[in-house]
Amino acid sequence: MFRPYTIEEGAYLVKLARSTVETFLKTGKIIIPESPPQRLLIDNYGVFTTIETVSGDRYELRGCIGYPEGYKNTLYATIYSAIGACCQDPRFPALRIDELPHVIFEVSILSPLTLLQDDPRKYPELIQVGRHGLVVRRGPYAGLLLPQVAVEECWDAEEFLLHVCMKAWLPGDCWLDRRTKLYIYEAQIFREKTPGGEIYERNLVAETAKCSPKTRRENEQ
């Protein structure tokens, strides 16, 4: 299982993402911390920052941007993915400073990508929902879905494959085409419980327990 960081290091990254966004929205400046944990300057993992609006017990995506295969180092990737999530996600308007008390920050640290080279028909058997994220690439098209997306949507492996193909603007069965390259990866995910509050590490395997057959049927309706 891919877990390179302690909860203290993960909390540092989530707090860094929030403080980076707050400073950027207030001043337009990107501040690099003076004395970060040294391993964050050495490691070079992929990083995604996700921002969600909280309304009661509901969460709505507000922005998600990142680097599948790293950017300089984990520290820089966190800083610049946070800026991207708040202000550069083309699906949403830029985050406003007054929204900060109402949004949750989540930072996902990605393992190196692994290319699947088996018979594509076997891919659903190789993908573990709650463990794997997916990347598809074909020519100029590419799409990525974080592992938590499949858990939150209660998808099975085939549904996960369909949606990552659609994310890349490819046919839903693109994964069956040998011209398509399919990659799997794992992620260590740190998240705020409340806006600016306590930070914890998500356990996606445990979260899949809510995806009963009944829940799946309700999601399909």
UniProtKB/Swiss-Prot annotation:
Top-rank taxon, per record: Archaea
Gene3D superfamilies for the chain: Hypothetical protein ph0010, domain 1, Hypothetical protein ph0010, domain 2
AMMECR1 domain mapped to chain residues: 8-201
InterPro entries recorded: AMMECR1, AMMECR1_dom_sf, AMMECR1_domain, AMMECR1_N, AmmeMemoSam_A, Uncharacterised_MJ0810
SUPFAM superfamilies named in the record: AMMECR1-like
A Pfam family reported for this protein in Swiss-Prot or TrEMBL: AMMECR1
PROSITE patterns linked to this entry: AMMECR1
The name this protein goes by in its record: Protein Pisl_1005
NCBIfam families with a match to the protein in the record: AmmeMemoSam_A, TIGR00296 family protein
Segments crossing the lipid bilayer: none
Lineage: Archaea, Thermoproteota, Thermoprotei, Thermoproteales, Thermoproteaceae
